[in-house]
Design a protein with these regions (language model features):
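Short, high-confidence coil segments that cap the C-terminus of an alpha-helix
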Residues: 75-77, 149, 187
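Conserved aromatic
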Residues: 57, 112, 135, 168-171
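Conserved ATP-binding module of the ATP-grasp superfamily
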Residues: 128-131, 151-154, 167-193
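ATP-binding N-terminal substructure of ATP-dependent carboxylate-amine bond-forming enzymes
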Residues: 1-107, 139
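A conserved helix-loop-beta module that forms one wall/lid of the active-site cleft
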Residues: 95-164
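A generic structural signal for short, non-catalytic loop/turn and secondary-structure boundary residues
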Residues: 24, 47, 128, 146-147, ...
Length: 193
């Protein structure tokens, strides 16, 4: 029987259905989460072979120990997944640390997390992508905008969804954005398209 660890199987609330179908397919479904077992939906409880509660999914050491426990108890882990973009890097680190080869590893993260790195892979696949510039200073951005014209869209190079996305339509908005960037986590890299 294959062992499948599902990280945070309770969120979103409909994810129990993934666990049910994995179990129906003959997998040994093992959940790791920070919600108390007694608060899990009955459907989720029925879909898991075992659940390990951690204090916080943000604490890598706790989650690591939970995976180690399941490995000791059930043997080699074949799959580990959360189906949640927020946990992509955590999932990859656990797969790498436990030699679980059925998914992204730590070394794969840049090409799937950074918009600028994704473009290279889209181009290799023949998918057109918008030209881009990594936001640096006014002169560098202005030079790029002279090539492509306004409006441009600026967003974090490594980000989930559309949060912190800015549409710039003129030089004044460009200056306003660059001021914003200098005060709001200045270590965040932005991509301009």
């Amino acid at each position: 029987m294959s062992n499948f660890i599902f990280i945070s199987p309770n969120f979103p609330t409909n994810y129990w259905q993934f666990c049910r179908e994995l179990k129906n397919d003959g997998m040994n479904v093992l959940g790791i989460g920070d919600q108390p077992y007694d608060e899990l939906k009955p459907e989720l409880k029925d879909s898991l072979n075992e659940y390990y509660k951690v204090g916080s999914l943000e604490n890598y050491d706790e989650v690591y120990r939970a995976v180690a426990f399941f490995t000791f108890k059930y043997g080699r882990i074949d799959w580990l997944e959360s189906n949640n973009e927020y946990w992509l890097e955590r999932d990859a680190a656990l797969r790498t640390d436990f030699h679980i080869t059925s998914g992204f590893q730590t070394e794969d993260m840049p090409r799937i997390k950074y918009k600028s790195k994704m473009k290279e892979y889209y181009q290799k696949a023949g998918i057109a992508t918008a030209r881009y510039h990594m936001v640096d200073d006014f002169e560098g951005c202005k030079k790029f905008i002279e090539e492509v014209g306004y409006p441009v869209v600026v967003k974090p190079d490594n980000g989930v969804g559309a949060s912190d996305t800015h549409r710039l339509s003129d030089e004044e908005e460009l200056r306003t954005f660059l001021t914003y960037k200098s005060i709001h986590p200045p270590d965040v890299s932005y991509i301009m398209e």
